[in-house]
């Protein structure tokens, strides 16, 4: 629908705007992505979608629009699934031995450097920094899930 409205609007532009070049581009969704849009309009970016835009439109006011609500709300189950997924991707952890209550050092045979790498991977996954004092206490996946749920205010 939006493409029909845009094409109808562009076709009604005065002849002075006719020689403006049209450019094919791809809209890519990114965390906190920004996109040019008309004033007061919000644009929802999906997967790679071609968009036809005018290279220059004199007199149009544009602003940056941010998408803050793109992610679904966190749940305890969702946090647990993401934590276990990140841990299963870690090459030093045997996925068959991994459970929510597996101790990193006692059950999985990891050392303190591996534990630091796991915490860094969790920071990347969830988008916030875990202080070293708190990171030293996180020795199993369930403790990580509880910590993230506490920091992100997730309660069920």
UniProtKB/Swiss-Prot annotation:
Modifications made to the protein after synthesis: Phosphopantetheinylation at Ser-112 is essential for interactions with LYR motif-containing proteins.
GO molecular function: acyl binding; acyl carrier activity; calcium ion binding; fatty acid binding; mitochondrial large ribosomal subunit binding; structural molecule activity
Protein keywords: Acetylation, Electron transport, Fatty acid biosynthesis, Fatty acid metabolism, Lipid biosynthesis, Lipid metabolism, Mitochondrion, Phosphopantetheine, Phosphoprotein, Respiratory chain, Transit peptide, Transport
Subcellular location: Mitochondrion
GO cellular component: iron-sulfur cluster assembly complex; mitochondrial [2Fe-2S] assembly complex; mitochondrial inner membrane; mitochondrial matrix; mitochondrial membrane; mitochondrion; nucleoplasm; respiratory chain complex I
Transit peptide: 1-68
Cited InterPro entries: ACP, ACP-like_sf, PP-bd_ACP, Ppantetheine_attach_site
SUPFAM superfamilies according to UniProt: ACP-like
Residue span(s) of domain Carrier: 77-152
Any one biological process term the GO annotation gives: aerobic respiration
UniProt keyword Cell membrane, yes or no: no
Modified sites of kind O-(pantetheine 4'-phosphoryl)serine: 112
Pfam families linked to this entry: PP-binding (PF00550)
Modified residues (N6-acetyllysine): 88
Family membership noted in the UniProt record: Belongs to the acyl carrier protein (ACP) family.
Quaternary structure and interacting proteins, as annotated: Mammalian complex I is composed of 45 different subunits. Interacts with ETFRF1. Identified in a complex composed of MALSU1, MIEF1 upstream open reading frame protein and NDUFAB1; within the trimeric complex, MIEF1 upstream open reading frame protein functions as a bridging scaffold that interacts with MALSU1 on one side, and with NDUFAB1 on the other side. The complex interacts with the mitochondrial large ribosomal subunit. Interacts with alpha-1-microglobulin chain; this interaction is required for the maintenance of mitochondrial redox homeostasis.
Miscellaneous field: In contrast to other accessory subunits of complex I, NDUFAB1 is the only subunit that is essential for cell viability in HEK293T cells. Since knockout cells lack assembled complex I and die in galactose media, this suggests that the essential role of NDUFAB1 is independent of complex I.
NCBIfam families given in the database record: acyl_carrier (TIGR00517), PRK00982.1-2 (NF002148)
Protein name: Acyl carrier protein, mitochondrial
Source organism: Homo sapiens
Gene name for this UniProt entry: NDUFAB1
């Amino acid at each position: 629908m939006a493409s029909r409205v845009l094409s109808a609007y562009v076709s009604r532009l005065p002849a002075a705007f006719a020689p403006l070049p049209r450019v094919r581009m791809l809209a890519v969704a990114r965390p906190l992505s920004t996109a040019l849009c008309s004033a007061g309009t919000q644009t929802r970016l999906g997967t790679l979608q071609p968009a036809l835009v005018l290279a220059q439109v004199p007199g149009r006011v544009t602003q940056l629009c941010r998408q803050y609500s793109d992610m679904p709300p966190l749940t305890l189950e969702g946090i647990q699934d993401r934590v276990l997924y990140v841990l299963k991707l870690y090459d030093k952890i045997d996925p068959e031995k991994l459970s929510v209550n597996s101790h990193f050092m006692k059950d999985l045979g990891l050392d303190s450097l591996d534990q630091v790498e796991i915490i860094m991977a969790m920071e990347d996954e969830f988008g916030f920094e875990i202080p070293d004092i708190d990171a030293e206490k996180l020795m199993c996946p369930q403790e990580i899930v509880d910590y993230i749920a506490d920091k992100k205010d997730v309660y069920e």
